[in-house]
Amino acid sequence: MKRKYILKKESEITAVFRSKKRCGNSSFIIYYSKQNVNTYFKFALSVGKKYGKAHERNLIKRRLRAIIRNYSSNLNPAFFFVIVIKPPAKNLTFQQLKTTFAKFASKINLLLSNN
């Protein structure tokens, strides 16, 4: 993923959480906010230590980055979003993660066109 698509500044991430807009289930929560000035979307991933060991946390982050990369051409450029991953996501396959992300993304109008 290119650096321009990643939320790095704490102030940007805090602003997304303060917007209090969210959508999720027991596996993960997507916090999002709409920005007026962006030409591309930005995102961040958060996995707590309760999720598991480092290699498990890295695996789920790699999977979600791959899913976001797959949908990147269809994601609304006006959005910043943070995905908080919870321990039940361990039991999901890549395909289940992909369908769950697509469902929530279309629900919050993050996708420009449904795939």
UniProtKB/Swiss-Prot annotation:
Keywords: Endonuclease, Hydrolase, Nuclease, RNA-binding, tRNA processing. The keyword RNA-binding applies. One of its GO terms (molecular function) is tRNA binding. Consists of a catalytic RNA component (M1 or rnpB) and a protein subunit. NCBIfam families: rnpA. PANTHER family: RIBONUCLEASE P PROTEIN COMPONENT (PTHR33992:SF1). This is Ribonuclease P protein component.
